Amino acid sequence: MRNPWLDIPEADYLGHMSSPTVGQRPVLGRLLGEVLETVRPNVVLVLGGSTGNGLEHVNPTITSRVVVVDVNPKYLIRLRERFPNPAFELDLWCGDVIEIGLGRQVFDLVHAGLIFEYVEWPVLLPRIAAALRPGGVLNVILQAPSASSPAVTPTPYSSLRKLESLFRFVEPTALVDAARGEGLNLHARHTEALPAGKSFDGFRFIKDAV
């Protein structure tokens, strides 16, 4: 089955995420910036990084390398155009986050913003845990269910409707329990309000130190 993300034009995705009724793009960028500032990681992995929203917050005096994974090659081409000569090493990996090799004990921070809803996250989570260094941080942003708005908010960018068949809400308790089983302990949790009655749930996990 073809991944629906491959059929979402960059302009549609950016327009949808930035539209007043969705308003998720600026929030996601800010949240990445906040975790970069708090964790101060040397090596970072961004899953589902799209066109690089939030990478403008990378401080190259602290972070020497950023790896971005996305399934859509056109998004990564645009990301490279946005950051042609960054002051940090920027590696772009195109592929499915479930299948692509992440390595072992490579990263100080793994950021997963609105990615778990679109993949088999119980399969991805152990791979993330293995890729984190001891004491490393997993930062997860989930979309919380809303009583007043569908999972994919209607906008003029109709191609986004293709994602409805892929989207699955993640039950927070299940995530926290599964993370604990992988040696990832919940350190902080917070809620971010969004337009149209939606909200994000943010989770920060720390990997057991050896």
Label every PLM stretch briefly:
Residues 98-110:
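A short acidic, Gly/Pro-enriched loop at the edge of an enzyme's catalytic core
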Residues 108-122:
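A short SAM/SAH-binding and catalytic strip from SAM-dependent methyltransferases
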